[in-house]
Amino acid sequence: MFYTKLKNTYDNKNRLTERTAKEKKTGKETVHTYRYNAYGDVAVQDDTQFVYGDVSGQVTKETTKLTKNKDVVKNYTYDSKGNKSTFSVKAGEDTKLSLSYEYDGSSRLISVKDSEGNQAVSYAYDTEGSLSERQAANGLKTTYGYDYQNRLTSMTNETGKGVVSKYSSTYLKNGQKAEEVSTVMDKNGKSTKKTAAYTYDMLGRITRETKTGREDISYTYDANNNRKQMTIGNKTTAYQYNKNDELLRTDTLHTDTEKNDVVIYKNDKNGNQLATVNRSEIPAEAKDTSYIDVDVTLGDNQLNDNVVNHYNALNQLTETLTKNYKVSFTYDAEGLRTGKTVNGEKTVYVWDGDQVVMELSKGGAVQKRYISGNDLVYADKGENTEKTYYVTDMHGNVVQLLDESGNVTKTYEYDSFGNEVKPEKKDENPYRYCGEYYDKETEEVYLRARYYESSVGRFITRDTYTGESDEPLSLHLYTYCENDGVNAWDPSGHYKIKMKHINGMKWKKNWKGRKWTKKNISMMNALLKKYGIKKKKSIALMMATCDQESGQGRIMQEEGDDNYCRSHGYTVYTKGAGYIQITGNDQLDFLSYIGVKPKTNRTEQISKKYAWEAACWEWGICQKGGHSMNKYVSDHGKSISVFLITQYYINGWPYSKGDKKYEQFNSDMISLRKKTKKFSYNRKKIVV
């Protein structure tokens, strides 16, 4: 329907000041503007203003225009380690939400309390750092069990009245789930035990799922990784695509009635799904359905069971028309959805990081509040209103709703790709599959960057992240979780996160575990020289910082639903990237410095290709600014989480020998302390 032309405007310091996307055919523009403070932080982004802390550089106040005379104001405070300690939301003069947070010595969240000091949820962790117990205010207690590979193998949800649901899983050698046994109580107090089993092909795509009480489901795929066929009982659905992997048509054959349900899809030139037209009960022998046309200008009276979508120049869904609904959407400069209007009734979304914390009317009245810790705990409609508590399974799917007394009020069940087994049209709860926001009007799951249509197991728009050449399945621009919805989820709308995770962080191959070769030693030396990191203490301290910031080199990017990322105000696209976790505008500055065009997901872009160079660039800035190492630690140590490790190199390790922390870091980095002109690590040499 249209192609998009993008234009970025920069100031004399090479900072982005305006981003304009223009539809070539219609001329319509989507514009986002940016202004900066004296320290180079974004001070104004569209209609949102930011205030930062003097020491930490973290956002302490965020103000967004709601109406002409009313603002939404979010306030943050942080502890000495940079963890979010309080968070509040005001709409106009009224405080709508106020929460406080507590952490253990490793900055793991252990408690969330409301404005009156009542504990909403608490968390406990095992010796490996994995979540072992979760306790909600209504008495809901969740316990977690793991195997020797730290895979989640058991999970029990119980209240004072007994177990409401429990799960256990076994895994294949490659880590994919083989079987899950569940026992779930319904609202009538009846518990049902079911067993689900999963089969995969050699590429890791799910090919078959069976579950007690349900018809078996099987899947096949074509050479381009598109779903080719799905069979459920006596129904077989075949899928057709064009050369760009855009879905064109589905044919669902009912073998018992010989009827063929046809759905035709229309796509624009940017690969966005414009419309779907349902033509039910076409005889199976009627192979020629070319006469079925898709009119994207259909009026309300012509829609019937059809759907029409409209997009802006950034390929964001802005409007959906169905038989019963007219739905429109708005977004901020980070791509997060700020509003949804259904048949004239507008809902405003208030975010904390990448999680919705509140829904407001257009005038600022509270419609819903969502209280979260490491995960979603409960929803209510304001202070002193009834709370609805969320219960999840091992995949993070919402499987039960409980009242304040711990009684089950609603249950959910899904297939591997998020289709509800028995959906209820009057259900007002939006959080369902993977604990993500489901739009019942469009029957799609909102995953921040894109919308997911579970009925076909695909996104309705192309991915702006094009994947990795060494991971062929990631190159597909439409599939959900590389056709494996059992062992992964996709909260960003860009890439899957495997179920094996630690505190929401994505673990990758790491520099500590990777052997130093002549090639990468040469690369490292070149980067050290390029960014002027030549002093032995500078090299030692930079490598120590990389070691500490990235969990001894294991983490190249922060993502997922990790509370640490949310508490620091990092959006889905600007969380820490590289071995020194650079964030936000630092990412733009770095990419501008090396002459690389920023992608939508800068965190992924930097982590995949520039992890080491970003670290050297960040450290080089410290040196070029004339900072002594002690001053750098004083100014930034707490905010970058390297205070103790930098003290180790500058003033000596504060702990005594024999202390577990001393031994851990000393054994890993003893070579960094050597007063030589060579940097030694993993028995290899990096020479300056």
Outline where the language-model segments fall.
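A motif-centric feature for acidic-aromatic and gly/ser/thr-rich catalytic loops and repeats
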Residues: 54, 100-101, 105, 233, ...
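Short, low-complexity export/processing leader segments characterized by acidic and small residues
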Residues: 337, 401, 419-421, 453-460, ...
